A protein has these predicted regions:
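N-terminal pre-domain/capping segments
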Residues: 1-84, 155, 248-256
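Conserved, mostly hydrophobic/aromatic
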Residues: 15, 23, 44, 72, ...
């Protein structure tokens, strides 16, 4: 994934140099927001990279204020226009967890309504939307199910790191449960390590508490052989490269 504080074109070159065969393109401030979709599409094609789209997790798509919801939808459409210009056909959305004084049922319903509208906007541009599991609300199958019920073509974007956060006493990583519920909708995967608890650390693979061989086994049992983003954040690029090498080694080693 490109770092949104740097030039998108420079980030694409960096990702290509590190041996990756696709880019998880995030369009958000401060720098990535200014990307020219046509330039991005030309560069990725020239380098032989495919791409999926990623959007800011903090867009208030389900805000209690109608004015904020309209603005968030307009901003999301702005992203979709850039993705469409780049030839990207799969884009994620994060449910909005920030609805104080609302019940779980209200939060789920408001997000289902918002994501239905965004999915329509995406479809008009030839793009399929996928929803990412989070770490508070929308961490469980029960939270996510109303979204999929409302939007039949909505894809599932599995974040294995998020599935390891805010677990109950004795509760294992939620990946197997989420795949059992939504494996037939699986469209993309994010991986990064953490130590559980509430901190989404985005550590290199193997630096936290996640059993990555078991995670890969679960993906293979679900029939997954598609795109996987190493969402490892560090100033030192070698941590990302090492995670790539480890993932490839484990993927080749593990059997379903």
């Amino acid at each position: 994934m490109n770092f949104p504080g740097r030039s998108v074109l420079k980030e694409i070159h960096r990702i290509h140099e590190d041996g990756f065969d696709f880019i998880d393109l995030t369009i958000e401030p401060p720098a990535a927001w200014k990307a020219d979709g046509r330039e991005v599409g030309k560069l990725t094609r020239d380098l032989g990279l495919s791409a999926v789209g990623h959007t800011a997790y903090y867009l208030p798509i389900a805000s209690p204020w109608p004015e904020m919801r309209r603005l968030a939808r307009d901003l999301y459409r702005h992203c979709l226009d850039k993705f469409a210009a780049a030839g990207i056909e799969l884009v994620n959305v994060h449910p909005d967890q920030r609805l104080p004084l609302h019940s779980k049922e209200q939060v789920r319903a408001r997000n289902a309504e918002a994501i239905e509208g965004l999915a329509e906007d995406a479809a008009e541009r030839g793009i399929r939307l996928m929803v990412e599991n989070l770490d508070r609300m929308f961490a469980t199958a029960a939270d996510l199910e109303p979204l999929f019920d409302r939007v039949p073509d909505l894809g599932f974007h599995l974040d294995i790191g998020h599935a390891n956060l805010r677990l109950g006493l004795g509760e294992p990583n939620r990946t197997p449960v989420l795949l059992e519920a939504f494996g037939d909708r699986l469209a993309h995967v994010h991986v990064s390590d953490n130590r559980g608890g509430g901190d989404d650390l985005h550590l290199p693979l193997g630096a936290g508490a996640i059993d990555w061989k078991e995670a890969i086994r679960n993906l293979k049992r679900a029939g997954w052989d598609g795109t996987v983003t190493l969402e490892v954040f560090s100033r030192e690029r070698e941590y990302l490269r090492a995670s790539r090498r480890a993932w490839i080694e484990w993927w080749q080693e593990v059997r379903a």
